[in-house]
Amino acid sequence: MGQSQSQIFEDLISNSSFSNEEIERIRKRFIKIDANQSGSIDRNEFLSIPSVASNPLASRLFSVVDEDGGGDVDFQEFINSLSVFSVHGNKEEKLKFAFKIYDIDRDGYISNGELYLVLKMMVGTNLREDQLQQIVDKTIMEVDKDRDGKISFEEFKDIVSGSNVTSSMTLDSF
């Protein structure tokens, strides 16, 4: 038999950085986003969130938030992702989330092709393909310390942790 609603709620509180009140506000927001009232947020519903819709990486965000790859985001996945962006979310969690944006095949590495695809989403048609490929190749050469042709999480963390990326991944309130 499954867990009771109160047990699920208690688990959400203990496994996230949110208070009771914040989880309740997030639950109400989740219900509003879930337009077809299926109990989960599908890709189209997710992409209809105004702050997400305007992001060039919206489809990648959905893929990362959809932790199990099931094609929709349940409330647990929603809370887990928002927890990363809370003021209480730690730097390591934020960096792992950012890394997953680039790690399209979820193999724990960012390949040349994955970096190219994600950067292409960000720059659109502002760069020629050969210019973008040069940037990707140069980035891989500079970041790939063990010379295996791909970027591991540790290599990513080394290069990104000196920036303010994690502070821009923090939302003040929910």
From Swiss-Prot:
UniProt-listed GO biological process terms: calcineurin-mediated signaling; intracellular calcium ion homeostasis; regulation of cell morphogenesis
Domain of life: Eukaryota
Ranges where the EF-hand domain occurs: 21-56, 60-88, 90-125, 131-166
Keywords: Calcium, Metal-binding, Repeat
Any one GO molecular function term: phosphatase binding
Any matching Pfam family: EF-hand_5
Binding site for Ca(2+) 3: 103, 105, 107, 109, 114
CDD domains with a match to the protein in the record: EFh
InterPro entries, alphabetized: EF-hand-dom_pair (IPR011992), EF_Hand_1_Ca_BS (IPR018247), EF_hand_dom (IPR002048)
Residue positions binding Ca(2+) 2: 66, 68, 72, 77
Ligand binding (Ca(2+) 4): 144, 146, 148, 150, 155
Binding site for Ca(2+) 1: 34, 36, 38, 40, 45
GO cellular component terms, A-Z: calcineurin complex; cell division site; cytoplasm; cytosol; nucleus
Protein family (similarity comment): Belongs to the calcineurin regulatory subunit family.
Other comments on record: This protein has four functional calcium-binding sites.
Biological role: Regulatory subunit of calcineurin, a calcium-dependent, calmodulin stimulated protein phosphatase. Confers calcium sensitivity.
Record text on subunit structure and interactions: Composed of a catalytic subunit (A) and a regulatory subunit (B).
Protein name: Calcineurin subunit B
Name of encoding gene: cnb1
